[in-house]
């Protein structure tokens, strides 16, 4: 499984400007912690993120870092009070130099307050238009290179920032799911681009032709002509060769690889999208060249509106915040056909009382269970009972050795499929999760989550996850919400593509409903300063401890309800 956290990028890419009619919002929340002393920075991924793209009608292009020139000291200037990030990964470094470790990072369009500076220009390449450039210390700790390709003083005239994440919502961005094969462009495509990369759309007999079918009087089925003075076939591009390669692989009976979908570097195409791939949405833009509406994605790509369906039916399930009136043990109904029972007076059985919906919560009584043959029933505080097979239980656990009296830590029971957050010995939150599907006693398609004691290594408001999975083919989900990595590529994160929490569904990560993942993300350490998109743990600000365990010896794989397979017809889970 490959995942592509933005913080791994070694080369920043820039957001272009978009038409002035679009309004943008900036996010600035949360208190600022002290900068931690860092652990080792995570290793780079096996692939770099796709470069963002520019709108065709840019009002003010971003600064090109490659064209930046060192600036000689000039006349006195007024120190800027805030900066705006231009790159998809704008690092905040522990010291004012390029090779210093990163404390965290900003995403394009984010603004943060400047505390002081500049503290020199060691490795900070400054554009000649910014004599005030250099390393500035920002709120939250650390230094940002200002005046080059990463960030500039705010406000930046003419810059149209992408929509910033909403930290008050269950989902930080709106999302769309792709249906059929479509193309993510690096900029708004022209008619010439469509002729080359989507020639089938110029045939009136093609249902998906849209408004371009009659463009410039093209007849049905007429092939595109070569540009003047060009003898080569314009459709013989790396991007179309990639499309043919995908088709050939499918004709041979196998799924394409993720790399087969990538466009030619520097060309108009970022990549091709397959059914079930998700993108995070910024805003719509109408192309003047084709008179079509395109979604600009948070990654900077452009996807035709007609190919994307908005994601609306994500799970609103919420676990239980624990306090003096709400305590463990708790249980949730996870069966589609669950019943609540009335115990017999002699305690030797129970009779059915009423059907209850899936995800119904129960407060369990501190009483012995009811056993009837091979069945076990847990008593509830209201005098009823629930069948052990139909529910998942969250029980109080003694803190592991070494946990401080108020230290935050997370307990994940992989057999019960529940998560409980603690502060010392006090539980503060409990909910259902979905861990890796598969059986730890079998190596066949085994995506089981790891067990052991870990710590949160990094936290990201969103992070893209994609890769190739044997049997399932490639998958791609841009900007997965509320991500906290705890062991290599394993993370706790929100999942909006399924709702079967309480069942094993993932490729190894710990899935939570978006509202639950948001609650845990905002609660956990290390703290995320205002305006930052991601933060790394350190020795002075370690990440919250995460315990993953099995509560039952040799517990078999329980599978998932039959309706779970019907719930998400596309896109494998993460």
Residue ranges of predicted features:
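Sec-dependent N-terminal signal peptides
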Residues: 1-37
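Ser/Thr-rich, Pro/Gly/Ala-heavy low-complexity intrinsically disordered linkers and tails
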Residues: 32-73
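Boundary regions of SH3-family modules and the immediately adjacent low-complexity/disordered segments
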Residues: 38, 68-80, 129-264, 295-337, ...
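Extracytoplasmic
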Residues: 78-80, 87-89, 107, 131-135, ...
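Short, structured beta-strand/loop micro-motifs enriched in basic residues and often containing a Trp
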Residues: 87-97, 254-264, 336-348
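SH3/SH3-like (including bacterial SH3b) beta-barrel domains
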Residues: 95-110, 262-277, 345-358
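Cell wall/extracellular polymer interaction/catalysis modules
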Residues: 353, 365-451
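Exported/periplasmic cell-wall-interacting domains
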Residues: 402-405, 429-432, 438-439, 444-451, ...
